[in-house]
Regions:
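Active-site acidic Asp-centered loop
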Residues: 37, 86-88, 95
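Short beta-strand/loop segment that forms part of the nucleotide-sugar
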Residues: 29-39, 54-56
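Active-site beta-to-alpha loop of glycosyltransferases that engages the nucleotide-sugar donor
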Residues: 7-18, 38
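Short, acidic, metal-binding catalytic loop of nucleotide-sugar glycosyltransferases
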Residues: 21-30
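Catalytic-site signature of metal-activated, phosphate-bearing donor transferases
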Residues: 65-67, 94-284
Length: 284
């Protein structure tokens, strides 16, 4: 079994090492591909066996990013049995029990491409301390927010073309209930706040701004904190935690997929607040 992982970065001093550690353990570091927009923080300077592809840091264009990553993924599936394609704060994790690891899933699961159940890792700031990135992440975080917008088709054996944001694609999404994507963007208040400053300082292309691509990356600080930390803390503190069962959401997700001009658009407005099962909290 030969599998690869592909990501796209700029100054990801926290998330990129976690991405390399996780996917490197599953696929081998020589099978990881990092597209680097000329990072300046040293995070891409000494990547060892990881393949670094440097591109010019022009004004960030979400459409160009999607096209570049699609083209790279299309090429890599000619040489690998499967390819993971996504941002470096997105870790694809199988249900621990049926599968021992992501490598085990790729080796044994029957799929041509697969859509993950998307879970945003939460930092409940009045219950949980600051994250120690040198220790297992999920052992330090209990809660997650299911979001239909993060149910991404990230793992594939066949070529895929994505729209900006990598949410929508040219194949009908197919969720596997045994495959999750943990989005670590909000796993820690301090880390996320520093990352949001980098995002807000980024120059965006006219096309991305006119289409409102990546709007959440440009949130002001107050809105960013409210939506990602204060609101989740209020929900969890009030005891509004639901069972770790997404049957209802998956049914609505699949029914809500719309095809437009050869691309499949997913519902973006479904949420569920859950406690991460102990077995999954050993994943990374």
């Amino acid at each position: 079994m030969k599998a690869a992982a592909l990501t796209f970065v700029y100054n990801e001093s926290v998330n990129l090492p976690l991405w390399i550690k996780y996917y490197g353990a599953n696929f081998g570091e020589k099978n990881l591909f990092v597209i680097d927009r000329e990072s300046t923080d040293g995070s891409t300077s000494n990547l060892g066996d990881v393949n670094r592809i440097v591109i010019p840091r022009d004004a960030f264009d979400d459409r160009k990013k999607a096209d570049f990553m699609s083209s790279m993924q299309n090429a890599l599936v000619n040489y690998y049995d499967a390819v993971v394609c996504g941002d470096c704060d997105e870790l694809v994790v199988p249900n621990i029990g049926p599968y021992a690891s992501l490598a085990d899933y790729v080796a044994r699961a029957d799929f041509d491409y697969v859509t993950c159940i998307g879970l945003n890792v939460l930092h409940i700031i009045n219950q949980e301390t600051a994250l120690d990135v040198n220790k297992p992440i999920l052992a330090q975080r209990r809660y997650a927010r299911f979001m239909s917008a993060t149910c991404k088709t990230m793992l594939s054996r066949v070529p895929i073309r994505w729209m900006p944001g990598l949410h929508c694609l040219d194949r009908r999404p197919k969720i596997d209930r045994n495959l999750f994507m943990f989005h670590t963007k909000t796993m820690d208040y301090g880390i996320a706040s520093a990352r949001q400053k980098i995002n807000r300082d980024t120059a965006w292309s006219e096309d991305s701004l006119s289409q409102n691509f990546g709007a959440h990356h440009r949130y002001d600080y107050a809105k960013f904190v409210r939506e990602n930390f204060l609101d989740p803390a209020n929900v969890i503190n009030q005891g509004n935690v639901q069972p770790f069962d997404f049957s209802e959401e998956i049914a609505k997700f699949e029914a809500g997929i719309v095809e437009k001009e050869g691309f499949f658009w997913i519902p973006m407005d479904m949420n569920r607040w859950v406690e991460i099962p102990d077995a999954l909290r050993t994943a990374f």
